[in-house]
A protein has these predicted regions:
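Active-site gating/metal-coordination segments in enzymes
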Residues: 54-55, 63-154
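Catalytic pocket-lining loop regions of alpha/beta-barrel enzymes
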Residues: 113-114, 126-235
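Short, surface-exposed alpha-helical segments at coil->helix boundaries
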Residues: 41, 70-74, 163-166, 193, ...
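Active-site environment of divalent metal-dependent phosphoester hydrolases
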Residues: 10-13, 63-66, 95-99, 122-123, ...
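Conserved, mostly hydrophobic/aromatic
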Residues: 6, 48, 76, 107, ...
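Active-site neighborhood of phospho(di)ester-bond hydrolases with catalytic His/Asp-centered motifs
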Residues: 2-5, 58-59, 90-91, 116, ...
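Generic structural signal for well-ordered alpha-helices
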Residues: 41-45, 73-80, 104, 132, ...
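Mid-to-C-terminal alpha-helical segments outside catalytic/metal-binding sites
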Residues: 1-8, 12-55, 105, 228-235, ...
Length: 274
């Protein structure tokens, strides 16, 4: 079995009215322009079948507009009904909206398997953000993983890179060691610091996905991450439609069968409670 641990789908209404949604949501504005590829569930399923992928996590973004968050959550939940065997639904919320806790509980009641993808840029205030901390408490109560975008502190700039640097992500883990976190893009490099015993000890509930790996890192990062952290904590993820599925899968060809079984199957089955 191959599970893609991070993809994105959006309703067609957003594709047709891109500029309208860019005006109302700052994260959407950061990530999307006229050249950004947006797909609906049917296109994702088609590409999954072509590339032998059995299941995919479908996630939102770190919205700053509550109504947009609801729209995308509803679409992901509808897509789950249409493709119950293929879609692993996640929900996302505006971490500054007082209505987000209610929205999260609504999505949990409808069967989401996790929260995310969240994009956190206001690093100075987020650790003391009451709404965000309540979201973490709800996630902990329901044993739900939280996908958070990780940003590399050096390297090339790109749309939506953000400022969720390893130093901040580790502070988040320190304060919330019982929560299950999945840090995208190998946590912006946080995975490498698990070679330090004190970091590894505190990060026992932290996982790392490989979203957009061909855009960010050489393929050797899979083996490097396994050696730095654990074979049990690395998740294959494409970030489709940003990156072609075939290209992402090709990057893993050199891994051993047991390494592939962990990143494709064993690890996501465990963390997503499949």
């Amino acid at each position: 079995m191959i599970i893609d641990s991070l993809t994105h789908i959006l309703p067609e209404e957003i594709s047709k009215n891109l500029n309208q949604f860019k005006k109302i949501d700052s994260i959407f504005n950061d990530f999307f322009d006229k050249n950004t590829k947006i797909v609906q569930a049917e296109q994702l399923i088609n590409q999954m079948k072509k590339n032998g992928i059995n299941k995919s996590v479908t996630a939102g973004f770190g919205w700053t507009n509550h109504e947009l968050a609801i729209m995308v959550n509803d679409y992901i939940l509808l897509s789950k009904k249409q493709f119950p065997e293929e879609i692993i639904p996640f929900c996302s919320v505006d971490i500054n909206s007082k209505k987000s806790e209610e929205e999260l509980l609504r999505c949990i009641s409808k069967g989401v398997k996790g929260i995310g993808e969240l994009h956190i840029n206001n690093l100075e205030n987020i650790l003391d953000n009451k709404i965000f901390n309540n979201i973490l408490k709800i996630a902990l109560h329901y044993n739900l993983p939280i996908i958070i975008h990780g940003s590399e502190p050096i390297g090339h700039k790109y749309r939506g890179k953000g400022r969720s640097y390893p130093k901040f992500l580790f502070k988040l883990v320190e304060k919330n060691q019982d929560n299950i976190f999945i840090f995208s893009h190998f946590g912006g490099g946080l995975v490498f610091y698990e070679q330090m015993p004190e970091i590894k000890k505190i990060s026992s509930n932290v996982y790392y996905d490989s979203a957009a790996q061909p855009f960010l890192y050489d393929k050797s990062i899979y083996r490097t991450s396994i050696l730095s952290s654990s074979i049990n904590k690395i998740l294959f993820a494409s970030d489709f439609p940003l990156i072609d599925l075939k290209k992402c899968l090709k990057q893993t060809d050199y891994l051993t069968d047991i390494e592939k079984k962990h990143i494709f199957s064993y690890n996501p089955i465990s963390v997503f409670n499949l």
